[in-house]
């Protein structure tokens, strides 16, 4: 699976490549800017989702619309907003959100449920506003008052999966306890699904990779290693990798990648959880935990700044 020579893109830069990326072939796609660049193509996202959803033949996604950093806001009764990394809809009326999560925090599971609730409401709202739904007879619309569209949340995690340690793939759905006791582990509804993928726990070699989902997991895990990745014979994957090649990245992408770690909210949740745990063990604060874990000086400095901030206005 040797990499074939590909035509080099012409990139005009006004600044030198940052030191952090010198000697590396790709940008790390577990960080937000490179993650967006990797999937900034309908065919790439369809290939990934078809693999993750295990769709084949006529079931494969044929039409896909998507948007990065989609804000979803409702009043319940106070205003509440979440921002999806990727919000996507298929031609068949399926609604999806795809999240890249680098850090685990104490309320991660709660967060996945909250995001799913917003996705369900957003999907229902768009479904009832569609031309197809409005064209239905009044009685049919009334019958479907509580009908929900299929919604799928995909969480790509750079850590162990909740309730599935050491595994790289897990799925959640709504089950009947009675049915499970009787050996029938079938979801009550196929419309409500969570898929969790652990990037570091995907340890298959390039030769062991099978199917598009595993190809994407392999590159998500190994693009950050620094070297050239093998050619899997998938042109869509190769084009996606070209978008995160250091030599192809413009100043804007390189600058964003250099400064991006995770969202402010992730750091606040994670740092607060670590600090509380540290205090319970008699540690001075979360900084000592960072240092013992071997965190980089940059991460320690950023954590110190965040913990020292008196209010959210400190973060710009």
Each predicted region: which residue ranges?
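Accessory alpha/beta interaction modules
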Residues: 1-193, 205, 277, 281, ...
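Short, charged alpha-helical interaction segments and adjacent helix-coil junctions
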Residues: 2-25, 29, 51-52, 87, ...
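Low-complexity, glycine/alanine/valine/leucine- and proline-rich hydrophobic stretches
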Residues: 172, 180-200, 209-223
